[in-house]
Design a protein with these regions (language model features):
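Polytopic transmembrane helical bundles with strong interfacial aromatic enrichment
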Residues: 1-185
Length: 185
């Protein structure tokens, strides 16, 4: 219904943007309400925190997937190198903010879901999936850190084709790791 109203609304209006954000939040809240957070009740802090977790994970994963699989490879020519460097910097900065929120909300969700017990993680399917997601997130964090602290500074200094390919290839691997996180979730 919200998406239908969005399509009817003006394409540049504030109402359309508000409706789109409402739809995004509704989808994230729906996803959160289908998971383990629903055990605490529909109007609970657990649902709110898990909704925020779904939203920020979508930002980080969406940026990684779109940048790694489509946008940055399309800018992989010497004539677009300046745009590639600016875009890579913006993707890295927004991703860093999203990652901080992913880790904070994820820690809250894990502590709440396990009751603070590592035994609950070890003895349950939910815990095994959580460990898999944590391993994939750790891989994505290592790849993102490699890009942010090694490949991107080199690319900014040299603007060379080799450094552009390095950044794009690592971003591609981060996108695959995030795809794995989404599949596991």
């Amino acid at each position: 219904l919200v998406l239908l109203l969005t399509s009817i609304a003006s394409h540049e209006g504030m109402l359309r943007n508000a409706l789109l954000w409402l739809a995004v939040i509704a989808v994230a809240a729906g996803k959160a309400a289908l998971g383990h957070a629903a055990d605490a009740g529909i109007a609970s802090a657990a649902i709110g925190m898990h909704t925020l977790h779904v939203l920020v994970t979508s930002v980080w994963g969406g940026l990684a997937l779109s940048a790694g699989l489509a946008v940055l490879p399309a800018l992989d020519t010497s004539t677009a190198r300046g745009v590639l460097i600016r875009t890579a910097g913006q993707v890295s900065s927004v991703s860093l903010v999203a990652v901080v929120f992913v880790l904070l909300t994820g820690a809250f969700n894990a502590a709440r879901g396990s009751g603070g017990s590592f035994e609950a993680i070890d003895a349950s399917t939910w815990g095994h999936v959580l460990v898999l997601k944590l391993a994939l997130v750790a891989l994505a964090l290592v790849l993102g850190g490699l890009n942010r602290f090694s490949a991107l500074p080199r690319l900014r200094r040299s603007a060379s084709t080799v450094d552009a390919h390095t950044f794009n290839n690592v971003m591609y691997l981060e996108a695959l790791a995030m795809l794995g996180v989404f599949v596991a979730a």
